[in-house]
Amino acid sequence: MQSVDLTEPLEAIKLKHGDRWYLAEDAVHDAEALWQGKANRHGVFMGYETITLAKVGSCNAEARIIQTGKGWWAATSSYDYGYGGAGSAPSVWERQAFLNREDALAAIAEEIASSFAAIAQERNGCSSEKHRSDAKRMFEELRAYKTPQLTLF
């Protein structure tokens, strides 16, 4: 998986703008310049694409991706299941920039797969056998997504 670690330049931007960097529009502009992308005043990239990676029963997994002017891909995940979920939109504060679309999608599929692996093991008052079964199938579909079958021809 090819990617660029943006931790250092993003930390430098935060340091430059002080403790309240997250409120500084100039900090967002500096991060936009790093990515060469257009974001709203909160740093969320404008015009990102949402791609459904897998759907089983009440479980859903999506990637949210955008290619910036630098040719990098920002990617985040969104997933939900019968009694919870998590997600975010791609922003200028993403620490990992992918060099191609396929790697971005594979990374997000892997990230969400690990969440569904944990959900499949839950034994709390909210989970049911159906939830665990659906989560296990989601894990399997997402693992297949990130490791596509190679063909000989």
Report each predicted region and the residues it spans.
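Short amphipathic beta-strand and strand-loop transition segments with alternating hydrophobic
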Residues: N60-Q67
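A short, exposed loop/beta-hairpin motif centered on an aromatic-Gly-Thr core
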Residues: S78-S114
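Intrinsically disordered, low-complexity charged/polar segments
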Residues: Q121-Y145
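Short arginine-rich
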Residues: A109-C126
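Beta-strand signatures of extracellular beta-sandwich domains
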Residues: A74-T76
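Negatively charged, low-complexity tracts enriched in Asp/Glu with abundant Ser/Thr
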Residues: M1-N60, K136-F153
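Alpha-helix boundary/N-cap detector
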Residues: V4, L99, D103, A107, ...
